[in-house]
Amino acid sequence: MARVTVEDAVNVVGNRFDLILMASRRARQLATQGKTPLVDPENDKPTVIALREIEENLITNELMDIQDRQEKHEKQTAELAAVAAIAEGRG
């Protein structure tokens, strides 16, 4: 399954090097950041799930960049709100 997925995913991405970078980034999101898979996991490991998502054009570097920026913005907004609440409590 994984070998066919790699070959098919390379056709989507263009070359193996970009595929490796994209798949490892997505697999890390799935494994450690609690991201929800966009395909049925079927008891596959995060790397295979990432390859399947790439193969089906469900995830791209651009999409992951946008998601990362949104999450960073939300985190910063929450931190600023917490600081403002603390400052108001002291003032």
Swiss-Prot record:
Biological-process GO terms, alphabetical: DNA-templated transcription
Reaction catalysed by this enzyme: RNA(n) + a ribonucleoside 5'-triphosphate = RNA(n+1) + diphosphate
Source species, domain of life: Bacteria
Record GO terms (molecular function): DNA binding; DNA-directed RNA polymerase activity
SUPFAM superfamilies: RPB6/omega subunit-like
Keyword Glycosyltransferase: no
Gene3D superfamilies: 3.90.940.10
E.C. code: 2.7.7.6
Entries under InterPro entries matching the protein: DNA-dir_RNA_pol_omega, Pol_omega/Rpo6/RPB6, RPB6/omega-like_sf
Species this chain originates from: Psychromonas ingrahamii (strain DSM 17664 / CCUG 51855 / 37)
GO cellular component, one term: DNA-directed RNA polymerase complex
UniProt keyword Iron present: no
Protein's UniProt name: DNA-directed RNA polymerase subunit omega
Function (record text): Promotes RNA polymerase assembly. Latches the N- and C-terminal regions of the beta' subunit thereby facilitating its interaction with the beta and alpha subunits.
HAMAP family associated with the record: RNApol_bact_RpoZ
Family: Belongs to the RNA polymerase subunit omega family.
Subunit record text: The RNAP catalytic core consists of 2 alpha, 1 beta, 1 beta' and 1 omega subunit. When a sigma factor is associated with the core the holoenzyme is formed, which can initiate transcription.
UniProt keywords, alphabetically: DNA-directed RNA polymerase, Nucleotidyltransferase, Transcription, Transferase
